[in-house]
Amino acid sequence: MTRLTHFDDSGQAHMVDVGGKAATARRAVAEGVIRMLPATFALVKDGGHKKGDVLGIARVAAIMAAKKTWDLIPLCHPIALTRLAVEFELLDAESAVRIAATAECMGQTGVEMEALTAVNVGLLTIYDMCKAVDRGMEITGVRLLEKDGGKSGRWRA
């Protein structure tokens, strides 16, 4: 079994030393879904929410969060992202919104956590903006879809 890299031989948490690793192109894609009442979905879809453009604000929040991942997750390295793209898919039949985030950098460690953080904060922002009309929204299916780069190469869910 592979050991957890964020713990030393005595079991103490530490930030992994990536100083000796070559900088390579890194890419990660994550996704998640938020389900809501049909009336709430209509507000989001039609842009009729009194707080403004729900998806536009969620996009900016997701981008900002990805850039702050190292500040939120204790053992993450600060990463100079070269790209963070956020896409929304409106799932009419489910009254749901799917968010996908793609993070890229040229670095010594991966960007999976940045993509996952972007997705989570984007979904939480949608929840925050819509909670006054629908407290029963459900965030689900947050996961890494793919990662590429570094020693471990390409991985896909």
UniProtKB/Swiss-Prot annotation:
Binding site for substrate: L75, C76, H77, M113, E114
CDD domains the record matches: MoaC_PE
Pathway involvement of the protein, from the record: Cofactor biosynthesis; molybdopterin biosynthesis
GO MF term (any one): cyclic pyranopterin monophosphate synthase activity
Class in the EC hierarchy, top level: lyase
Keyword tags: Lyase, Molybdenum cofactor biosynthesis
Enzyme Commission code: 4.6.1.17
Pfam families xref list: MoaC
Domain of life according to the entry: Bacteria
Active site per UniProt: D128
Gene3D superfamilies: Molybdopterin cofactor biosynthesis C (MoaC) domain
UniProt-listed SUPFAM superfamilies: Molybdenum cofactor biosynthesis protein C, MoaC (SSF55040)
Reaction(s) catalysed (UniProt annotation): (8S)-3',8-cyclo-7,8-dihydroguanosine 5'-triphosphate = cyclic pyranopterin phosphate + diphosphate
Disulfide bonds, paired cysteine numbers: none
Example of a GO biological process term: Mo-molybdopterin cofactor biosynthetic process
Subunit comment: Homohexamer; trimer of dimers.
Family: Belongs to the MoaC family.
Function: Catalyzes the conversion of (8S)-3',8-cyclo-7,8-dihydroguanosine 5'-triphosphate to cyclic pyranopterin monophosphate (cPMP).
Protein name in the entry: Cyclic pyranopterin monophosphate synthase
